[in-house]
């Protein structure tokens, strides 16, 4: 974007070990999956409450 400028004093992040990156990635994927699972369970509960016409 033309309006944004990069910070001049930005320091590059230190190199991480591959195992540490794998753990962080797995943790983030787990959180993402947990959020999706919770949303699906909530939607199922709502649909059971409001669509119980059978």
UniProtKB/Swiss-Prot annotation:
Residues 41-50 are annotated as: Required for mitochondrial location. Highly expressed in adult T-cell leukemia cell line. Changing residue 32 to E: Loss of interaction with MCL1 and of increased MCL1 degradation. Its main location: mitochondrion. Induction: Up-regulated by p53/TP53, phorbol esters, double-stranded RNA, IFNB1/IFN-beta and viruses. It is found in: Mitochondrion. Disulfide bonds: none annotated. Keywords: Apoptosis, Mitochondrion. A motif (BH3) lies at residues 29-37. Changing residue 32 to I: Alters specificity of protein interaction and enhances pro-apoptotic activity. GO terms for cellular component: Bcl-2 family protein complex; cytosol; mitochondrial outer membrane; mitochondrion; nucleus. One of its GO terms (biological process) is response to dsRNA. Interacts with MCL1. Interacts with BCL2A1. Interacts with BAX. Interacts with BCL2L10. Belongs to the PMAIP1 family. The BH3 motif is essential for pro-apoptotic activity. Promotes activation of caspases and apoptosis. Promotes mitochondrial membrane changes and efflux of apoptogenic proteins from the mitochondria. Contributes to p53/TP53-dependent apoptosis after radiation exposure. Promotes proteasomal degradation of MCL1. Competes with BAK1 for binding to MCL1 and can displace BAK1 from its binding site on MCL1. Competes with BIM/BCL2L11 for binding to MCL1 and can displace BIM/BCL2L11 from its binding site on MCL1. This is Phorbol-12-myristate-13-acetate-induced protein 1. The lineage of its organism: Eukaryota, Metazoa, Chordata, Craniata, Vertebrata.
């Amino acid at each position: 974007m033309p309006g944004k400028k990069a910070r001049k004093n930005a320091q590059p992040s230190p190199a991480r070990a591959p195992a540490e990156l794998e753990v962080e990635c797995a943790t983030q994927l787990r959180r993402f999956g947990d959020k999706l699972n919770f949303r699906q369970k909530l939607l199922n509960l709502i649909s059971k409450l409001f669509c119980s016409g059978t």
